[in-house]
Amino acid sequence: MSHKHALFNKVIAGLLAGLLTITAGGCSASDAQSLIDEARNYANSSQSSASQSSSSTSSGSDGTWSETDAPNYYKVTGKADFSAAGTMPSAGEIRYSELDSLGRAGMAVGVVTYQLMQSGSDRERDMPDTIAGWPEHNPKVEIVFSDGDKYHGYLFNRSHLIAKSLGGEDAERNMVTGTRTQNVGDNDATPGGMAYTESRARDWLRSHRNGTIEYMATPRYTGDELLPRTVDVDIRTSDGSIDEHVITYNTAAGFDIDYMNGGTK
């Protein structure tokens, strides 16, 4: 049964029950009309909420990447939207999702402060041995960028959802298996991939030590695939000077990523 039909049945059932109550109590026709109007308003508002929820869930999840549109493996698509997070954490705190049944990380959301950033930067790195989708063999590759530059090194990184340099922990629930380009783009003068928002956040906090940054990273998986096709990042500074929704693409030019199992095809 569709959501629309289920909602209709629910409203009608409530309406009939209410009318029976009104009839038994000998209430007026105006009371009955009031109940009908209330039911109609409920149906309209519920359908609107369901539509918004469906839209936010599917945003950016197909992972389609165009080198023309996103040569450095990220794309700014609008303003930040933290509605999926519900209540935001307190300043200086990060909230992580628990791993799902496939061992995959979910949404991570925090309110980053200068002190949290410093604590992450000062902390010793302690990376987990493996995460969901980590390949048995991580190939060394050459990736050619649109400007002709080349990267030589490992194809896959343990990519933080919220960077260690922003206070994010080195743990499975804060990491996805990402390509080198998803993690840092071409790693040149202009950071790309996840590094685009991470570098903007660090630079802003260094200039606004009493400010805060709302920051949320959401991996987007297709079905039971272990690797996300994209990671969506929402970032908003307390002064509003940065307010962006960013899609980072988990791919690499010239390679066919095996999103289901990890590695390449």
Locate each region found by the language model.
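C-terminal motif of bacterial Sec signal peptides marking the signal peptidase cleavage site
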Residues: 22-26
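Domain-level detector of nuclease and nuclease-like folds
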Residues: 89-265
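Bacterial signal peptide processing site
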Residues: 28-30
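N-terminal, intrinsically disordered, polar/charged segments of Gram-positive cell-envelope systems
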Residues: 32-84
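Hydrophobic helical h-region of N-terminal Sec-dependent signal peptides
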Residues: 13-21
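Intrinsic structural disorder/low-complexity segments
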Residues: 6-8, 50, 55, 163
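Bacterial N-terminal signal peptides that target proteins for export
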Residues: 2-13
